[in-house]
Each structure stands twice: as C-alpha cells, then as structure tokens.
C-alpha cells in the first residue's frame, strides 16, 4: 500500500501524522511511504530522518493525497477537499459533528473516513483520543494559570497562592482523561480543585486517587451554576465521543463569574461545552484568547481547537505511539479486514461509500445512519 503523510495546514499546527519509527514499521512490512518535504519540521523531525527510516520525500501535498491511505493529525481543511478521491482511506482526527462542509466532501468523494476520536474499546476507553486528551488537559491548567496573571487580562492570581493567601479555585467540568490530567497539574500547582461529572463511579475513583483532596460534585445544572460562579479558572472537558458537545455552562452562568477569571474550553473541537466559547468558535495559537463581558469587567476565554499543536514534539510522539499499530494493520490487511478483526477500530469508521456510519455525526448533521455490520460481514 502507498501511504501519504502531507504537511498539516491548519493555522499553527506543528504536529505531523507519522514519526520515523512509523515509517520504518510500514517500510519493513513492504509498504511505500510518501512524506511531504518539511512535514515534520514543526515537531523537530528532519527530512533526513524520514529518509533514513525509508520514506520517499515529495514536494507537494497532492502526491501524498494520491496515495491509498493518508495519515494526518487534524481534520482536512477546505483547500484539501479537492484532493480527496474515491476509495481513499483517511486516518486522522475528523471531528465531523461540527463540520458539515467536510462531511459533505467526504461523502461526495466516497472517502473511507476513520476517525481517531471514535476508535473505542468495549469498556468505553478511547485509545487514540486519550494521548491528546492527556496533553490538552495538562496544558489547560498551564494556560489557565497564565491567563490569571494581570498581564494576560486576569485578576492577578498565583495558582497556588502563598503562605497566608488563598490559592486559586480551579473548576473542571468532566472527569475523563482531560479532566483528570488538568486536575493533576492544578493540584501540583497548589490550587483548590473542584471536578464535576455525571458518572458517580468515576467521581469515587477521583476521590480515592487524590485522597479526598479534590472536591467532587455530581454534574447537574444547580451544581454547575454554583461552581462556575465561584471559579477562578473554569476548564471545560466534557466529551460525548464523536458527537456535538452539550453546552453545560450557559451565558447566564458565565455572567456570574468574577471579573478577571478565566475559561479554557478544551471541548471546542467538538463544538464546545461553554456557551460563550461555543458561540465565538475556535481561536488560534497566535491569538488564543478573547474577552467576554461580565458585571464590572471581563472573563478571559481560551478556545484553541488544536491545543496539543503548541507542544508539537511531545504530542506527535505521544499520538503516533497510539496510532501506529492500527495504521500498520490498515496497511497490511486493508481497511475492511483490519476492521473485521478489531471492533475498536471498526468504531472509527465515520464515512464509507457516501454514507455515514457514526451516530454522533448522523444526529448532529441529519444524515441517515448506516451500520458497519452491513459492510464488515
């Protein structure tokens, strides 16, 4: 199989879809790997390293997109839609629920869209989303701490406080991988932490893990409103795999926040879980924040849709450690046999032959839902 690795074109996206180790694994299995020149530079991977691993370096993205399978990090953007072709296996984060134009293009070109974020084990674990969720969660607290400084428009709080001065209060919506990672960093910085989730079993796990040092609350409108009002930093980390994120924090709730407090909406790539950030839309690393007016001042809001791209080298190697085994399987067996042999990978199928195969996308965009059982017989 011919596997193409184009350069990511999203604004300030520095990750790349494959490492030299991935190239080597595909090459050893008898496949051809085409990497666009310079694709790895944002992750500090040189063209020479790819060549040494067995890749062919090509000048244009089109040469990569003309392959049997394209491996990326972020969802394709409009300039790439014309490069789709029927039967192409596209293996990347897709986040289709809030992307009607991309979904339409994939269906029209009959692309086999396998989304990292919906590959799922029977127990609900998301093996290809978890690596970047861990990075984004850790970043959320670091970014939030900076936003609370006066020079960034915050109220001038030090996350951990000092002797005799109260620490900042970090409120985290969602106790999944993002939320847990954000909580670990916040606790390490000395903050007071509250985490909300609808899964009481998960909250018990969090309580045990941190020895009761984190306040855990059942996620309901009353508790969310109260916690939001008291938050110095609000982190949105709610996830329904592959579906639009529910807007759990309303504009009215945000209006009760203290002037100079901060919001980080990690869920923005699935539509956002906090109304002001969801309405504003994704921001970019070169201008990551915007101000939202509240009584007597403003809240600093951060809604970058590709947070891990800022720490590209860590993110690229973390992600490809997880994606590589499935990538090699797809190349060795073909997409259909690979998905027949692995139920988790089969759940990653979002589009095939002009049809939608993932419920979250179907529900969000109004397409008829088809069952992978019909194509994986």
UniProtKB/Swiss-Prot annotation:
Catalytic function, reaction form: L-alanine + NAD(+) + H2O = pyruvate + NH4(+) + NADH + H(+)
Enzyme class, first EC level, given as a word: oxidoreductase
GO BP terms in the entry: alkanesulfonate catabolic process; L-alanine catabolic process
Entry annotation: catalytic residues: 95 (proton donor/acceptor), 269 (proton donor/acceptor)
Residue sites binding substrate per the record: 15, 74
Top-level taxon in the UniProt lineage: Bacteria
pH dependence remark: Optimum pH is 9.0 for reductive amination of pyruvate and pH 9.0-11.5 for oxidative deamination of alanine.
Pfam family membership, one: AlaDh_PNT_C
Keyword field contains NAD: yes
Gene Ontology MF annotations: alanine dehydrogenase activity; nucleotide binding
Induction comment from the UniProt entry of this chain: Up-regulated in the presence of taurine.
Keywords, in A-Z order: NAD, Nucleotide-binding, Oxidoreductase
Extra remark: Taurine is an abundant dietary and host-derived molecule whose metabolism to hydrogen sulfide (H2S) by members of the human gut microbiota has many prominent connections to host health and disease. The human gut bacterium and opportunistic pathogen Bilophila wadsworthia produces H2S when respiring sulfite (HSO3-) released from organosulfonate substrates such as taurine and isethionate.
UniProt function note: Involved in an anaerobic respiration pathway that converts the sulfonate taurine (2-aminoethanesulfonate) to ammonia, acetate and sulfide. Catalyzes the oxidative deamination of alanine which regenerates pyruvate, the amino group acceptor for the taurine--pyruvate aminotransferase enzyme, and liberates ammonia. Can also catalyze the reverse reaction in vitro. Cannot use NADP(H)(+) as a substrate. To a lesser extent, is also able to deaminate L-2-aminobutyrate in vitro, and in the amination reaction the enzyme can utilize oxaloacetate and 2-oxobutyrate in addition to pyruvate.
NCBIfam families: alaDH
Family under the similarity heading: Belongs to the AlaDH/PNT family.
Name listed for the protein in its UniProt record: Alanine dehydrogenase
Source organism per UniProt: Bilophila wadsworthia
Source taxonomy: Bacteria, Pseudomonadati, Thermodesulfobacteriota, Desulfovibrionia, Desulfovibrionales
């Amino acid at each position: 199989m011919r596997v193409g690795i184009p350069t990511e074109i999203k604004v300030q996206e520095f990750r790349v879809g494959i490492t030299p180790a991935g190239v080597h694994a595909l090459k050893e299995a008898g496949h051809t790997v085409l990497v666009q020149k310079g694709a790895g530079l944002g992750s500090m991977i040189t063209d020479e390293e790819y060549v040494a691993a067995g890749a062919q370096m090509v000048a244009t993205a089109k040469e990569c997109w003309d392959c049997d399978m394209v491996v990326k990090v972020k969802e394709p953007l409009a300039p790439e839609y014309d490069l789709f072709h029927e039967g192409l296996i596209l293996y990347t984060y897709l986040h289709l629920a809030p992307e009607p134009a991309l979904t339409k293009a994939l269906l029209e070109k009959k692309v086999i869209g396998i989304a990292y974020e919906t590959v799922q084990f029977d127990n609900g674990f998301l093996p290809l989303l978890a690596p970047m969720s861990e990075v984004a969660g850790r970043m959320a607290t670091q970014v939030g701490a900076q936003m609370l400084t006066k020079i960034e428009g915050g109220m001038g709080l030090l996350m951990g406080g000092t002797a005799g001065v109260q620490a900042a209060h970090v409120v985290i919506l969602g106790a999944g991988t993002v939320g847990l990672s954000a909580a670990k960093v916040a606790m390490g910085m000395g903050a007071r932490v509250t985490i909300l989730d609808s899964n009481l079993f998960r909250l018990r796990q969090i309580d045990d893990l941190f020895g009761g040092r984190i306040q855990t609350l059942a996620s309901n409108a009353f508790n969310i409103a109260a916690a939001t009002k008291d938050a110095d930093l609000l982190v949105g980390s709610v996830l329904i795999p592959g579906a639009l994120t529910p807007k759990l924090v309303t504009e009215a709730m945000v209006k009760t926040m203290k002037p100079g407090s901060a919001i980080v909406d990690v869920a923005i790539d699935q539509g956002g879980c906090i109304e002001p950030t969801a309405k504003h839309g994704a921001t970019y690393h070169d201008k990551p924040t915007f101000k939202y007016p509240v009584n007597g001042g403003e809240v600093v809001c951060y809604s970058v849709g590709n947070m891990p791209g800022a720490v590209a080298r860590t993110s690229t190697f973390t992600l490809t450690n997880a994606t590589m085994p499935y990538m090699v399987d797809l190349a060795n067996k073909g997409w259909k046999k690979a998905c027949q042999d692995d139920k988790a990978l089969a759940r990653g199928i979002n589009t095939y032959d002009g049809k939608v195969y993932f419920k979250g996308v179907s529900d969000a965009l109004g397409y008829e839902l088809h069952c992978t059982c019909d194509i994986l017989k």
